[in-house]
């Protein structure tokens, strides 16, 4: 059409239906716009109709609002609603007033990890309805003064909020270039203008295929500069406010200062509201762009983490949700996590737990879960008092799972296990265990309980009342290996709790069978092996439940998995403390089977240590001592292992050989000879390999060396050796090895090797001061953690 053919444009607006907004407190007015181009004679030449809608938000609507007055005001101010529809508007407002915000179930279903879109704000809410055909007019407004630029950007934003318009806007390079230029040049002039333009680009950022456009105009870098500037401005506002508050506090009678402070405070509140709208939309845009890790790295290099952690000091829930969501995304990379550590993030997050806002609390807990993989941050969480706060959340169904995961990570550290005893955590966990209706307990719950049961104080709380009885009943009913692992941890602690297991020895022994699931059998065996109770008649247990054939059968190389075989060896070590049991086992031919296993597993220190511990137990008893010394090659193996690089193995060997030497003179000579040879090996090698000349033979004083080497039997010089127990020298000095260093294990102070004894005698007449059970592979193997891990969330 030629320009002269059209004289003017006729626009007609026709009102339509009115309805309530599905989620907000707002009315939706449907209307139709009809545009007609008239010719020179006034006749219509071209016409177009478009259906539109206007949203009237009713922020002030609450339970006490006068509906009649509000309806009248809405009809008066909105020209799209005919006065005849006043009663209809009133009914809709009444419905909105009484409508519940959302159903709890629905809200839970719709909950997303992504924050909500920024709401409408002052500057974008204008009465004018934008039209995609009027884009040229809106672009022209961007070249005018600030108020016109704000208006033009608001109209373009109105269009951009409708995803259907984005493709068309993308083709309008003039508009996008003008918006980017105005933002770059004028963002300091008007917060509303900056917010509008960033919001327009945010609409594009919601779709990954538009990210190239935002990168092209360098909007991301500009947003980071704006955020940094606004955060610094906020600090200046706070400083100014703080100075005026201090002046008022120092001169309470001065009303002028009070009025000045009140005025400044109101101004500050208004500025903060606008600033937080800007921060929210800018950060959301960056969060969308950060889905590309290369872009995220650029943000990290521009200190995005520091900016976000600073923003945690705000009180605006919606802004905080966005900030914490961003931090959660960033926290999966170590560099970002380290930046958060520098900014003391845990101290800032602790104030949000608990909080009234459900979404904020949920996302904060998820950020803490990510951070809790770091040992130092777990330590910080305990220091700032998060333990009782997280424990309190276990009772809330919405947060129970995520809070438990964080607590589980904290429970991995031995230092913190005992602290759980001073919260109400354990009673809550026990309640959850017994209320769990599924055949298998939640992995997170049982893993957490397994860790806590490694501490003696916690175990006392677990066993209170019928705690152990209920656990045993459930574990045996469901054949649950993880629940039995928890029971096994309970059984390892000396004291009253160990004696509670006397009632369940039969139940546990009945599970030791090849017909049961191997994992479950391992845990039952491990629990029985922990029951070093003097009054327990192990011979009766072995005979009644026919355990000896099972134990012997599993010792054959390749007969079972290594984990099960190791538990069998440990079990044999426990029952061998009993004289009659040791004899029973010796008669069954278990000792040769152990030696064969020792040959097969000689590279595995754990196996070696536990097998020689069985020998150590057996040499205490006359019946088994003779078998070991006279009928097997066990002493020879022990001599070979005397100088093993593993300290634990050396210790058990030395003590076992000392007992053998005490009862057998022939072996005593061999043992002493080997000890002497090893102790003096370097010196002897030097002497035998060199011919000392005249100048060297007096290096060692006046005493001649020859008598020690050539004259007489070397074994006739007992002053050169340790005595039979290997600890006391001929001068009566005590070897330093006699003393154990103490350390912290599972939150309890224990001996260096987890088996300190007193110098008294045990129930079988054995001196406890020499040796106790070596640390077992259960929970302490170097190749696997003692706690149960679960999948990352």
From Swiss-Prot:
Residues 103-123 are annotated as: Disordered. One of its GO terms (cellular component) is glutamatergic synapse. Phosphorylated on tyrosine residues by SRC in vitro; this reduces the binding affinity of the protein for RAP1GDS1. Gene3D superfamilies: Leucine-rich Repeat Variant. SUPFAM superfamilies: ARM repeat (SSF48371). Keywords: Phosphoprotein, Repeat. ARM repeats lie at residues 333-373, 374-412, 494-533, 578-620, 621-662. InterPro entries: ARM-like, ARM-type_fold, Armadillo, KAP3. GO terms for molecular function: intraciliary transport particle B binding; kinesin binding; protein phosphatase binding. Residues 103-119 have a biased composition (Basic and acidic residues). It comes from the Eukaryota. One of its GO terms (biological process) is anterograde dendritic transport of neurotransmitter receptor complex. The modification Phosphoserine is found at residue 60. Interacts with SMC3 subunit of the cohesin complex. Heterotrimer of KIFAP3, KIF3A and KIF3B. Interacts with RAP1GDS1/SMG GDS. Involved in tethering the chromosomes to the spindle pole and in chromosome movement. Binds to the tail domain of the KIF3A/KIF3B heterodimer to form a heterotrimeric KIF3 complex and may regulate the membrane binding of this complex. This is Kinesin-associated protein 3. It comes from Mus musculus (Mouse).
